[in-house]
Amino acid sequence: PYSTPLNDAQQKGNGRRLDIKKNRIRSTYFANGILHYAYITPTSAFGAVSAIAYGRYDVSTKSNTMTYIGATGFNYAFPAIMHFSNLDAKNNTLITFLASNNTIYPEVRALMIDEKMQASASIQVKAGDSYVNYGIGNNERWGDYTGIARKYNSVNPEVWVFGCYGETNNRWGNYLAQIMAQPDLPP
């Protein structure tokens, strides 16, 4: 289901909330006849927080498969997705996203979804250093600049991810990181 999260995200050290009510498909790519897509959604599976909905739409069969990615009590938001295998025929996806709650500062994370729609454990790409507090009003803008790019023709699966985190000056910091994995073996 496609709906807007009810509450904005909390952040450690400050009562100001992070705006997550920008609900729309955030990222897509097309490979092997499948449209891969991701967006933010509320789901009761992780409490009253936002999660990431990741889907695969098979164009030829017109079938859709979904999975929800989150952690109890944590807001996961603003996903960016990309094919993550050295084998073009393999439907592995890397998702980078932003995370926050009242026990952590806003940070950048990533995980992989395999061909069977199973998610790996998420990894911390960049920890937040502090809370964000520089906007006007009760909420801080969040998630405007999350991105991902694949390095094509690489021996290993390789992507570059970009996201924002809380800097020590209480503003947003930008972070760019390379993520690689061991090569997939042909069937």
Q: Locations of the language-model features?
A:
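C-terminal PAP-associated
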Residues: P1-P186
